[in-house]
C-alpha cells in the first residue's frame, strides 16, 4: 500500500509515476473523496464536542434543580447525528482504503520505462549455451525415457498442469532443492524456515495477493462455511508466510537484516495463461520453489536487491547453467515491486532463455499493509521496514534446465558436479 499522505498531498506526482507502469490513478476522485473526508472529520469532531458539552450541562442543570428534559432530548438528537456522521465517515474511509489497496507500487526512478516484457532490458549474461552435435530432446521426452515424469498419472489423480515424478528424476528434483537450501543457509546467511502451506486472508492482504489477485489463488471450501479454514488459501509462494512473520512487529534495527529461506510447494491457478506452456514443467498449478526473503532498513534495500539477485545467480553458476539477468520495465513488474530483476536460464529445446528467478525490492509497500516497523534502541520513533523477495530458484524449472543442458547423445543425463553429493556420488541418470 502506498503512503496515504502521498496520495492526499501529492496525488499528481504519484499519478505520474504510476502512469509509467500503465496504471491510471483517478486523481479527481481521490481529491473529491479527500475533501469529503475532511468535511466529515470536522463534522464528527464538532458533534462529539457539542454532545460532550451538552451532557456536562445536564449535570449542572440537575444540580441547580432545573428541568433537564429539553437538554436530554438535545443530547439524544446530537448522539443520533453523531452516529450517522461516524457511519458515513467509516464508509468513506473504507472506500478510500479499497481504492488504496488496488493501487500498485510506484516504480523506482532507475526502472526502465516500458509496456511489457518486450521492453525489459538485459543487464548481463553468464555462460555460453552448449552446442549439441545431436538432436536435442526436451525434458518431457527425457523424463519419459527415464520413467521419471508421468503427466498422464497426474491427470488421472488431479488434472492438467500437474506431474508425478518418479525414481532418479524425483531424486534429482530433491537434490536441487537441498543444494539450494544448503547454499543459501551456509554461504549466503539465510535462516532455513518451515512455513504453513495454508494461510489466512490477513496474511494474503499483508503481502498484496488480496484483494486484487484472489482469482489467482486456490481457496479452501470446507463443508462447514463457518469453519476457520474457510478463510484459508494455498500459498502461491513462500514469500507470503515468510514476509508476514514480521507483521505487527517492531524490530530492533540492530537485528536487521532478517534473511529467511524456505523450500515449499507453490500453488497457482495460472488464470490468464490458457494455452501457454501446456507441455512439460514450465507452467504448473503446483511447483516447488526455494524462496529468499529479506527484511531490511530502508536505506539499504537497493543494495539488498543486488545481493539477493547475486545469491540466485550463484545457484545457476554453480550448476553451470547459462543465464541472463533482465531489468524488468515498468509495465512488466509485479503489483508490489518497486524494482525487479528476472533471471532467465537457457532452455536448449526451446532455443531461448526462460524465467527461473524473480528478485524484487518491494520497499515499504508490504510493510505498510503489515505494520512491520523498526527502531533503534536510542530512538522511540518507529519507521516501516523494507521487504524483498526472490526465487532461489524455482526447482522444477531448474530441473528442466539441468535435464536439457546436461543431456547426452544416448539419452543419459549428466548430473552436475555440485549435485553429486546429494545423489550418492552418481554421475549420470540412465
Curated annotation (Swiss-Prot):
Swiss-Prot/TrEMBL catalytic activity: tRNA(Ser) + L-serine + ATP = L-seryl-tRNA(Ser) + AMP + diphosphate + H(+); tRNA(Sec) + L-serine + ATP = L-seryl-tRNA(Sec) + AMP + diphosphate + H(+)
Pfam families: Seryl_tRNA_N, tRNA-synt_2b
Chain residues that bind L-serine: 237-239, 291, 391
Protein name: Serine--tRNA ligase
Domain of life: Bacteria
Function: Catalyzes the attachment of serine to tRNA(Ser). Is also able to aminoacylate tRNA(Sec) with serine, to form the misacylated tRNA L-seryl-tRNA(Sec), which will be further converted into selenocysteinyl-tRNA(Sec).
Pathway stated in the Swiss-Prot or TrEMBL entry: Aminoacyl-tRNA biosynthesis; selenocysteinyl-tRNA(Sec) biosynthesis; L-seryl-tRNA(Sec) from L-serine and tRNA(Sec): step 1/1
CDD domains for this protein: SerRS_core (cd00770)
NCBIfam families recorded: serS
Entry EC number(s): 6.1.1.11
Compartment(s) of residence: Cytoplasm
Residue spans crossing the bilayer: none
InterPro entries linked: aa-tRNA-synt_IIb, aa-tRNA-synth_II, aa-tRNA-synth_II/BPL/LPL, Ser-tRNA-ligase_type_1, Ser-tRNA-synth_1_N, SerRS_1_N_sf, SerRS_core, tRNA-bd_arm
Keywords linked to the UniProt accession: Aminoacyl-tRNA synthetase, ATP-binding, Cytoplasm, Ligase, Nucleotide-binding, Protein biosynthesis
Positions contributing to ATP binding: 268-270, 355-358
GO cellular component: cytoplasm
GO biological process: selenocysteine biosynthetic process; seryl-tRNA aminoacylation
Family named by the database record: Belongs to the class-II aminoacyl-tRNA synthetase family. Type-1 seryl-tRNA synthetase subfamily.
Quaternary organization: Homodimer. The tRNA molecule binds across the dimer.
Domain comment (free text): Consists of two distinct domains, a catalytic core and a N-terminal extension that is involved in tRNA binding.
Gene Ontology MF annotations: ATP binding; serine-tRNA ligase activity
PANTHER family according to UniProt: SERINE--TRNA LIGASE, SERYL-TRNA SYNTHETASE
Amino acid at each position: 500500500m502506498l503512503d496515504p499522505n502521498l496520495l492526499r498531498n501529492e496525488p499528481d506526482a504519484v499519478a505520474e509515476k504510476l502512469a509509467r507502469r500503465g496504471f491510471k490513478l483517478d486523481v479527481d476522485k481521490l481529491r473529491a473523496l479527500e475533501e469529503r473526508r475532511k468535511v466529515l472529520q470536522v463534522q464528527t469532531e464538532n458533534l462529539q464536542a457539542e454532545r460532550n458539552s451538552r451532557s456536562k450541562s445536564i449535570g449542572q442543570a440537575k444540580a441547580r434543580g432545573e428541568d433537564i428534559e429539553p437538554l436530554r432530548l438535545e443530547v439524544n438528537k446530537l448522539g443520533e447525528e453523531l452516529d450517522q456522521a461516524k457511519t458515513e465517515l467509516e464508509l468513506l474511509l473504507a472506500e478510500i482504503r479499497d481504492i488504496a489497496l488496488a493501487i500498485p507500487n510506484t516504480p523506482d526512478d532507475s526502472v526502465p520505462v516500458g509496456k511489457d516484457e518486450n521492453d525489459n532490458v538485459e543487464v548481463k549474461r553468464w555462460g555460453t549455451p552448449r552446442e549439441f552435435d545431436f538432436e536435442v530432446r526436451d525434458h518431457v521426452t527425457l523424463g519419459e525415457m527415464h520413467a521419471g515424469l508421468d503427466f498422464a498419472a497426474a491427470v488421472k489423480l488431479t488434472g492438467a498442469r500437474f506431474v508425478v515424478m518418479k525414481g532418479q528424476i524425483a531424486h534429482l528434483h530433491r537434490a536441487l532443492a537441498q543444494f539450494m537450501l544448503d547454499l543459501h543457509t551456509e554461504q549466503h546467511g539465510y535462516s532455513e524456515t518451515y512455513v504453513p502451506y495454508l494461510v489466512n486472508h490477513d496474511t494474503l492482504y499483508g503481502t498484496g495477493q488480496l484483494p486484487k489477485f484472489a482469482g489467482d489463488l486456490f481457496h479452501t471450501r470446507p463443508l462447514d462455511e463457518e469453519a476457520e479454514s474457510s478463510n484459508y488459501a494455498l500459498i502461491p509462494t513462500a514469500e507470503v508466510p515468510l514476509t508476514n512473520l514480521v507483521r505487527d512487529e517492531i524490530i530492533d534495527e540492530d537485528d536487521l537484516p532478517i534473511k529467511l529461506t524456505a523450500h515449499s510447494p507453490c500453488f497457482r491457478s495460472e488464470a490468464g495463461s490458457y494455452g501457454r506452456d501446456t507441455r512439460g514443467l514450465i507452467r504448473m498449478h503446483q511447483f516447488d520453489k526455494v524462496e529468499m526473503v529479506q527484511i531490511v532498513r530502508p536505506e539499504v534495500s537497493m543494495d539488498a536487491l543486488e545481493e539477493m539477485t547475486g545469491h540466485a545467480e550463484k545457484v545457476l553458476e554453480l550448476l553451470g547453467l547459462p543465464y541472463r539477468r533482465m531489468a524488468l520495465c515498468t509495465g512488466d513488474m509485479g503489483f508490489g515491486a518497486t524494482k525487479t530483476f528476472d533471471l532467465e536460464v537457457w532452455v536448449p529445446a526451446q532455443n531461448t532463455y526462460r524465467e527461473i528467478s524473480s528478485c524484487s525490492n518491494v520497499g515499504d509497500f508490504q510493510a505498510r499493509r503489515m505494520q512491520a516497523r523498526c527502531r533503534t534502541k536510542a530512538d522511540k520513533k518507529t519507521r516501516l521496514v523494507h521487504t524483498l523477495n526472490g526465487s532461489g530458484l524455482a526447482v522444477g524449472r531448474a530441473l528442466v534446465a539441468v535435464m536439457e543442458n546436461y543431456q547426452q547423445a544416448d539419452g543419459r543425463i549428466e548430473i552436475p558436479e555440485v549435485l553429486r553429493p546429494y545423489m550418492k556420488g552418481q554421475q549420470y541418470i540412465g
